[in-house]
């Protein structure tokens, strides 16, 4: 498979993982390693910034994994910039998953504040990966603002409903000049494969793995599905017929004559 490149860094894995909702840090770490991921995002609000030996960080930081702090919980661009600067100081990284969702019930991203924050953070030297609505116009504006990727949602966070925004994702992928990472709503390995078959650069999964009966096995399933979907995309999927008339793969016409 082709390597994924974000801000000049190469990734072999196209499966990114979130770290919420696991029943223990040990299970979380096992799932991370089983998935083969090289990008793990963690909410700053879950980390004790004053404790360099925070137990959770011990289970996340590995040599081949890019830590991606996120700003989940902030309500506007001003709070996002403040949180980003704290993250850079605490973790020593310019990488940032930008999340601004002021409504705590649906956790839908605020498009206006997300674009505003992206513009400011890029100027401050951050590598910005914004979580956003599956809005083709917005995604293009974020790209023009200097975002390293766009991360449009497939469905609301934690719903496991799959690619409810599929048609919009197709447009976003088609017109993007930067990687497109489908984030939120991916609830089954088949959803991840579908996103990759569309041409998404990567997928970010959290809830579906964390709340599974066996998170480690589910991480392995998502790893396989993500790879399969990407391989299918690179191989070139056959066109779907626009009707239900069958076409034999091995015609017998000449044989019967």
UniProtKB/Swiss-Prot annotation:
Residues of the active site: 97 (schiff-base intermediate with dxp)
MF-aspect GO terms: thiazole synthase activity
Domain of life: Bacteria
Listed Pfam families: ThiG (PF05690)
Keyword Magnesium: no
Catalytic activity from the UniProt record: [ThiS sulfur-carrier protein]-C-terminal-Gly-aminoethanethioate + 2-iminoacetate + 1-deoxy-D-xylulose 5-phosphate = [ThiS sulfur-carrier protein]-C-terminal Gly-Gly + 2-[(2R,5Z)-2-carboxy-4-methylthiazol-5(2H)-ylidene]ethyl phosphate + 2 H2O + H(+)
Alphabetized UniProt keyword annotations: Cytoplasm, Schiff base, Thiamine biosynthesis, Transferase
Major location category of this protein: cytoplasm
Gene3D superfamilies, sorted: Aldolase class I
EC number: 2.8.1.10
Compartmental location: Cytoplasm
Pathway stated in the Swiss-Prot or TrEMBL entry: Cofactor biosynthesis; thiamine diphosphate biosynthesis
Binding-site list for 1-deoxy-D-xylulose 5-phosphate: 158, 184-185, 206-207
GO (cellular component) term, any one: cytoplasm
One example of a Gene Ontology biological process annotation: thiamine biosynthetic process
Family stated for the protein in its record: Belongs to the ThiG family.
General function of this protein: Catalyzes the rearrangement of 1-deoxy-D-xylulose 5-phosphate (DXP) to produce the thiazole phosphate moiety of thiamine. Sulfur is provided by the thiocarboxylate moiety of the carrier protein ThiS. In vitro, sulfur can be provided by H(2)S.
Self-association and partners: Homotetramer. Forms heterodimers with either ThiH or ThiS.
Listed name of the protein: Thiazole synthase
Gene name linked to the record: thiG
């Amino acid at each position: 498979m082709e390597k994924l490149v974000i801000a000049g860094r190469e990734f072999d894995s196209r499966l990114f993982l979130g770290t919420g909702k696991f029943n223990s840090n040990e299970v979380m770490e096992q799932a991370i390693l089983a998935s083969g991921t090289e990008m793990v995002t963690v909410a700053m609000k879950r980390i004790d910034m004053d404790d360099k030996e925070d137990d959770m960080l011990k289970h996340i930081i590995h040599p081949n994994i890019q830590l991606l702090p996120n700003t989940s919980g902030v309500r506007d661009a001003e709070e996002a910039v403040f949180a980003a600067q704290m993250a850079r100081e605490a973790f020593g990284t310019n990488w940032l998953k930008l999340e601004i969702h002021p409504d705590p019930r649906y956790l839908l991203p605020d498009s206006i504040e997300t674009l505003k924050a992206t513009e400011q953070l890029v100027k401050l030297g951050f590598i910005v990966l914004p979580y956003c609505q599956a809005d083709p116009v917005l995604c293009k504006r974020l790209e023009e603002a200097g975002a390293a990727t766009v991360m449009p949602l497939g469905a609301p966070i934690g719903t496991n409903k799959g690619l409810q925004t599929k048609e919009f994702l197709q447009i976003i992928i088609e017109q993007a000049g930067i990687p497109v990472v489908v984030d939120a709503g991916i609830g089954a390995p088949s959803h991840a494969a579908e996103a990759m078959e569309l041409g998404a650069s990567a997928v970010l999964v959290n809830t579906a793995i964390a709340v599974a009966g066996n998170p480690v096995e589910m991480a392995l399933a998502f790893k396989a599905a993500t790879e399969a979907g990407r391989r299918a995309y690179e191989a070139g999927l056959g066109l779907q017929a626009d009707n239900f008339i069958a076409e034999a793969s091995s015609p017998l016409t000449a044989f019967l004559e």
